[in-house]
Amino acid sequence: HMVTSIDGKVIGEFLNRPECEAATEIYYEMNREYKAQGSGGFICGRVTMEGSFTGGWYPDLSEYKPVARECGHYMNCWFDDVADAKYFAIAFDPKGKLGWKSNIIEDSDPGYGGAMIIEVLTEQVDPRYLAYLEEKEISYFFAGETEIDVPLALKILRDHLSPEFYV
């Protein structure tokens, strides 16, 4: 679900207008209800995650050594360790541009707060970004060469989290 302006925009000043207040509250109520009913999490693109959670901060990758993809084509070695988590924030971040401070979303809204982060990347990501994610213990996997292959990403999530996984 999503709140949009009449012209299809998903971000902008319209979200702060009094006329939109009821719609945005319904949006957040639905999100909290989905979480309470056992939704596996939520998926957002890089721009939304940046605007809502990372604030545009980006790590200095010069401090990191490139990580080789040793665990196969699609996921890092410890991806399966997240399967016990109850709720996920799945970031479609093709080029690896999000600057997370930890591996958990810290947000006052219970519909988002406490979600474990999983990064969905493409193979064009800087291998130093993988080292950054591993330092933060953020799980990631690859779903596409230059663009995210959404059906593949959803299949990987279901295969590694739960066959009943839904967002």
Briefly describe each language-model feature range:
Residues 157-167:
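A contiguous pocket-lining binding segment that forms or flanks enzyme active sites
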Residues 2-6, 12-156:
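Active-site ligand-binding patch in enzyme domains
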